[in-house]
Amino acid sequence: MIWLVLILASLLSVTGQLCQKQATRPVAINKRRKHIALWLGLGLVCLGLAMVLWLLVLQTVPVGIAYPMLSLNFVWVTLAATKLWHEPVSFRHWCGVAFIIGGIVILGSTV
């Protein structure tokens, strides 16, 4: 159960970061203030919820195991950036993502 909470905390944290990125996207000048307020507001809500869930995780999982699991954020952000904004990702970057996933699997199997 706690691993699901950790994954949810990671996804909420990433969603908050993606909302911040979306807030920086260009929009018509007459819609800019509303656009920024919306996306930054959503980002703050997601990051706040992620922090609450993270505190729940830290109550039961050793920080030396839990913290590296947040490397999942790099994986989620890479996937989202390629899908949402069509950002290019190099082969080297994908190799890094694969290493992160491998590290998470190794650490996760030790608990």
Swiss-Prot record:
Entry annotated with the keyword Nucleus: no
Keyword vocabulary terms for this entry: Cell inner membrane, Cell membrane, Lipid A biosynthesis, Lipid biosynthesis, Lipid metabolism, Lipopolysaccharide biosynthesis, Membrane, Transmembrane, Transmembrane helix, Transport
Transmembrane segments: 38-58, 61-81, 88-108
GO molecular function: carbohydrate derivative transmembrane transporter activity
A Pfam match: EamA
Record InterPro entries: EamA_dom, Flippase_ArnE, Small_drug/metabolite_transptr
Pathway per the UniProt entry: Bacterial outer membrane biogenesis; lipopolysaccharide biosynthesis
Periplasmic face of the membrane: 59-60, 109-111
Topology of the protein relative to the lipid bilayer: Multi-pass membrane protein
Cytoplasmic-side positions: 1-37, 82-87
Any one GO CC term of the record: plasma membrane
Domain annotation EamA: ranges: 40-109
Subcellular location: Cell inner membrane
Gene Ontology biological process terms, A to Z: lipid A biosynthetic process; lipopolysaccharide biosynthetic process
Similarity remark: Belongs to the ArnE family.
Record-linked HAMAP family: Flippase_ArnE
Self-association and partners: Heterodimer of ArnE and ArnF.
NCBIfam families attached to this UniProt entry: PRK15051.1
Protein name (record): Probable 4-amino-4-deoxy-L-arabinose-phosphoundecaprenol flippase subunit ArnE
Organism of derivation: Escherichia fergusonii (strain ATCC 35469 / DSM 13698 / CCUG 18766 / IAM 14443 / JCM 21226 / LMG 7866 / NBRC 102419 / NCTC 12128 / CDC 0568-73)
Gene: arnE
